[in-house]
Amino acid sequence: MKFVDEATIIVEAGKGGHGCLSFRREKYVPKGGPDGGDGGDGGSVYLEADSALNTLIDYRFQRKYKAQNGEPGAGRNCTGTKGEDLVLPVPVGTTVVDMDTHEVLGDLTKEGQRLKVAQGGFHGLGNTRFKSSVNRAPRQTSKGSEGEARNLRLELKVLADVGLLGLPNAGKSTFIRSVSAARPKVADYPFTTLVPNLGVVSVQAHQSFVIADIPGLIEGAAEGAGLGIRFLKHLVRTRLLLHLVDVAPYDGSSPADAVRAIAHELEKFSETLASRPRWLVLNKVDMVAEEDREAHCQAIVDELGWEGPVFRISALSGEGTKPLVQAVMRWIEEQAEQEADNPDFAEQEAARRRRMDEEARQKIEADRQARRAARNADDDDDFDDDDYDVEVVYAPE
């Protein structure tokens, strides 16, 4: 199934049912009082997180959704039936944004979590409601109100504990295949991975974490080069970044330059995301002669001036992957324990995630506006007014 991580939809809640104008009329009761019932409330629209879904593709084919209207009231003080609520399933990890106000309405991060996005209309009142001591036969009713309507943008960000960074062909997909049951496509050409892939890494019984592999970045990605930066938003929810680098690139390029290029693109996308804990993973060490391996890897670390954790692995053979995933598991457990025991730390972490979300949204929106402006400029060039005044000269036969 095609992976779609953004969709725009229009939701409209149901209208409230109108109140009823009615009077009691029975045998031997020629002048009964008012008995018009209220209308029913209109149905509301909800979004519900569903773990069985992993894409927003269904919302690309149908964009308009409307809840049921409330039924009008009836005589004998019968209240109209309430309109049925409309519940739209979305993948876990979906952010809902009001396109008109740019307000973030909510984040659906847990299975079964619901978010009301359009309030149903209020019911109208029947004439019974307007009876008083001075008005025994009211002919006044009220109409049900309109349901709320909204233009929404749905943004899916995958939920993962660990995110993989690196240039195309750095071995990210091979690594996730090596440590989990995920089976992303692997080939010897750039941009084999076109959509994010998730894998569950089981370290031992009841100890596991989720890892996300996104399409590779290249220099200039923040300006739209390669696959651009649209997939970087999927790293916003991660706790830890693993930066994979090929220690023996086939084109002879510098591994240190590759690391710096990705770090630069990350900073341009989100400074908060760039400040996330990031570990350096030197991959494909089996491509370097064993006697030169230590010196070669250390030279890369020295050139970068890297002060964080460094791991040397071969994703293809599995060499060094077990110590890496064990270290990641320990780090994640320590972070979770610290968040549980320290409310201040938990609040700082939540604030950091909100900043990353906002920075990512602003960057992606700016990128979207730039692409739209470029397309409009191209269209204008195709319709130059001077084209209609071209002089046609016929060559003599």
Swiss-Prot record:
Limits of the Obg domain: 1-159
Cofactor(s) recorded in Swiss-Prot or TrEMBL: Mg(2+)
Gene Ontology molecular-function annotations: GTP binding; GTPase activity; magnesium ion binding
S-S bonds: none
Composition bias type Acidic residues, residue spans: 336-347, 378-390
Residues at which GTP binds: 166-173, 191-195, 213-216, 283-286, 314-316
Biased composition regions of type Polar residues, renumbered to the chain: 129-144
Main function: An essential GTPase which binds GTP, GDP and possibly (p)ppGpp with moderate affinity, with high nucleotide exchange rates and a fairly low GTP hydrolysis rate. Plays a role in control of the cell cycle, stress response, ribosome biogenesis and in those bacteria that undergo differentiation, in morphogenesis control.
Cellular-component GO terms for this entry: cytoplasm
Protein name: GTPase Obg
Domain called OBG-type G: residue spans: 160-333
Keyword GTP-binding: yes
Residues holding Mg(2+): S173, T193
UniProt xrefs under PROSITE patterns: G_OBG, GTP1_OBG, OBG
GO process terms (BP): ribosome biogenesis
Family the entry assigns: Belongs to the TRAFAC class OBG-HflX-like GTPase superfamily. OBG GTPase family.
